[in-house]
Amino acid sequence: LWNKIKYGAILIIVTNIFAQDFWTQAMNSHYSRRVSHFNNLPVKKGAIIFIGDSITEQCNWSELFDNPDIINRGIGGDVVDGVAKRIEFLKTSEPAALFLMIGINNMNRGDPNDAIFKEYKLLVEKIKAYNPSIKLFLHSILPINENSFIGIPIASNESIEALNQNIQKFSGNMDAVYVNLFSHFLNSERKLDKKYSNDGLHINGEGYLLWKQIIKKYICEI
């Protein structure tokens, strides 16, 4: 009996390792395909760019706002430094505005807030150096809900809020607009409201409609 238990435990561990390896490879392949795709798409003058991770990628922004000038440059799994490596197109294009949300994947892989914010500042400075006239909007990172989270989150809403406060303070130094989404998505327990998410991290259609209501005034002014 003991040998059967040990065999079963080993089988579960090996299966989990292979599953994790599969999803890691799948995410890496998806990432490289998206980067390759974006590198072959011209950014037209006056475009409005949404850039970030899967939360950005999963929205059809141009349809949401009925605006063909909006383009999506989100990639699932991306981190701050990943976005920094993807913005070379700003050197040779003239988009009107850029909406940025990034950082939750850094937090969920265990990066400390100080390190994330240091990379974030370098990213924003790089954006402004490449395109000084661009209208830059810095989204707060959204809250999470640990009760419905897939797996065990490393990030906490307390750490997210602390990073958001740093981003807000920094935005004023960079002539950027800070967009507070965080507080709008909270429930009474100060977690991501379940009506906007089914996994505690990503948002659903209702969530994107709320996001639209918060930023539509900025889109209309561009």
Which residues fall in each region the model found?
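Oxyanion-hole/transition-state-stabilizing segment in secreted/luminal serine hydrolases
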Residues: 50-51, 56-69, 80-118, 126, ...
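N-terminal secretory targeting modules
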Residues: 1-49, 57, 61, 220-222
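Charged helix-capping and loop-helix junction motifs
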Residues: 113-123, 156-163
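A short helix->loop->beta-strand "cap" motif at the edges of active sites that frequently abuts
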Residues: 131-135
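Extracellular/periplasmic catalytic domains that process cell-envelope and extracellular macromolecules
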Residues: 41-44, 64-65, 92, 129, ...
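Acidic/histidine-rich helix-loop elements
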Residues: 22-25, 67-80, 108, 151, ...
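General small-molecule cofactor/ligand-binding pocket signal
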Residues: 71, 137, 177-179
